């Protein structure tokens, strides 16, 4: 009998990793057990407060032993992931893993740690995995150059409750400001302040929270900061804007990009890993180094066509199949 365990250091937070696995669990017909830091004593990671660090390794190990899985998917490289990997190695359990986040780049930005050290750790962590799931082709190419093995592409999806009916599209009046939306964590590595600097050029709405929330809200008075929004409320916000702006240059994917596209929003972003794997330049968005220009360029793209094509391309059921096929093959 197949018994699958999902081991993750990120499950209760609002981020792309948690969103991915919760949606996978919502659509799967398989029986999957989950182990995460919220089940044990934990502390927040100082550099990334939303991440919980579990400090009860023996309890985690014996919890896994009690579940007695035949296959394990290790979602993250934190303490839960490390203990799950150790369990697999000691008990000859097949496992797959996933690469979600460019933590080496984050750590270099935050504390100056050379990326070579972090990537050396990650390479060793994923070395025995039967399949290392990556979110995009450009991410896969980057990791191959760094010496990673067994890389497998893993797509994402969008939930139905995050898709709202499109209002009738009108050509944007040049005398009115373009309505620009950004959704995500408000922190230094997300580069959101580059968009904030354009507060006098566009009507900007920012959805999300994080370490920079209060700082940005106090500094940029012409921007609407809404905090976290979910489900249908978030879908309505997507549908009521003209352009979605994705500012990060260090993400491996960007689920919010496909959420925006599935609501018909053209995307303005940098030509970097993540956006360039999702956005068709000059078709459903504009990729370039100048965010202001990119926003203006894609502001009158056909939202109905963007939405129609995006909804065909992104499915959680397809993502679920890819995840478990790679684990059970």
Label every model-predicted segment.
Residues 126, 228-229, 236-241:
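Short alpha-helical donor nucleotide-sugar binding micro-motif in glycosyltransferases
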Residues 293, 300-329:
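A charged, aromatic-enriched C-terminal amphipathic alpha-helix characteristic of glycosyltransferases
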Residues 1-40, 321, 328:
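N-terminal subdomain of nucleotide-sugar transferases
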Residues 266-269:
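Short hydrophobic beta-strand element within catalytic cores of glycosyltransferases
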Residues 20, 35, 120-166:
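Donor nucleotide-sugar binding/catalytic pocket of nucleotide-sugar-dependent glycosyltransferases
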């Amino acid at each position: 009998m197949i018994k699958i365990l999902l081991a993750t250091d990120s499950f209760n937070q609002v981020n792309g990793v948690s969103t991915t696995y919760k949606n996978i669990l919502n659509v799967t017909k398989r029986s999957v057990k989950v182990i995460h830091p919220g089940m044990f004593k934990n502390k927040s990671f100082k550099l990334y407060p939303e991440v919980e660090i579990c400090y009860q390794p023996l309890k985690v190990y014996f919890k896994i032993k009690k579940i007695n899985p035949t296959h394990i998917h290790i979602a993250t490289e934190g303490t839960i992931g490390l203990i799950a990997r150790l369990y697999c190695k000691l008990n000859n359990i097949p496992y797959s893993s996933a690469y979600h986040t460019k933590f080496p780049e984050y750590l270099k930005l935050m504390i100056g740690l050379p990326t070579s050290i972090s990537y050396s750790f990650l390479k060793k962590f994923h070395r025995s995995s039967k399949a290392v799931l990556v979110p995009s082709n450009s991410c896969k190419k980057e990791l191959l150059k760094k010496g990673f093995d067994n890389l497998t592409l893993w797509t994402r999806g969008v939930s139905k409750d995050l898709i709202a009916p499109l209002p009738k599209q009108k050509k944007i009046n040049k005398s009115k400001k373009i309505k620009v939306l950004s959704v995500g964590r408000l922190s230094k590595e997300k580069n959101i302040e580059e968009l904030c600097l354009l507060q006098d050029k566009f009507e900007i709405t920012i959805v999300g929270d994080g370490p920079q929330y209060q700082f940005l809200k106090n500094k940029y008075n012409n921007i609407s900061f809404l905090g976290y929004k979910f489900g249908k409320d978030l879908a309505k916000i997507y549908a009521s804007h003209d352009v979605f702006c994705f500012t990060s240059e260090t993400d491996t994917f960007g689920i919010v990009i496909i959420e925006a596209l599935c609501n018909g929003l053209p995307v303005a972003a940098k030509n970097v890993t993540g956006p360039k794997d999702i956005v068709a330049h000059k078709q459903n968005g504009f990729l370039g180094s100048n965010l202001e220009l990119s926003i203006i360029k894609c502001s009158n793209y056909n939202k109905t066509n963007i939405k129609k094509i995006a909804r065909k391309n992104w499915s959680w059921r397809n993502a679920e199949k890819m995840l478990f096929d790679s684990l059970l093959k």
